[in-house]
Regions:
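Single conserved hydrophobic/aromatic residue that forms the stacking wall/gate
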Residues: 1-12
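Structural preference for beta-strand elements that scaffold enzyme active sites
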Residues: 10, 40-42, 78-82
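Active-site beta-loop-alpha junctions enriched in small/polar residues
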Residues: 14-15, 46-50, 81-88
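Conserved, mostly hydrophobic/aromatic
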Residues: 43, 110
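Substrate-binding cleft of secreted/luminal carbohydrate-active enzymes
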Residues: 64-91
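PLP-dependent enzyme catalytic core of the Aspartate aminotransferase-like
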Residues: 111-124
Length: 125
């Protein structure tokens, strides 16, 4: 199963991203030390990696794509990205006048950003 790189939290509960080139390289080195036959990773573009700022997912995915294209070993390692997406961007609480297609859990990018992001992934891969 692929490793999910979601980011980390420190002892002060600060969010620490782990999607940068150096983080992916460190993961690859750890996998190589274990002699894994099929190392794989999926990068979570939200949560701790975005410091829960859902619009940052667009920039993070771009950086992950750049990392994959820069290093052939990392291109083989990084199998995908996880993005929080829904029809309407943001989030809402349950009750009252709810908006169809808007998340009731984590904030998400909306449909337009999702389409642009998928197009970018298709172009860069």
């Amino acid at each position: 199963d692929p490793e999910m790189s979601r980011g980390l939290g420190d002892v002060y509960k600060r969010q620490i991203p782990n999607y940068h080139y150096e983080d992916c390289k460190r993961l690859l080195d750890m996998y190589e030390q274990k002699n894994l036959k099929n190392p794989a990773a999926i990068i979570d573009a939200n949560h701790s990696n975005s410091n829960k700022q859902y619009k940052e997912q667009l920039r993070i995915v771009s950086e992950v794509l750049h990392t994959r294209n820069y290093d052939p070993k990392l291109k083989k390692l990084i199998k995908g990205v996880m993005v929080e997406s829904y029809l309407v961007e943001g989030r809402q609480d349950i009750g009252g006048n709810m908006v169809y297609g808007k998340s009731i859990t984590d904030p998400c990018i909306g449909w337009e950003d999702t389409v642009r992001l998928i197009d970018k992934i298709a172009e860069d891969c």
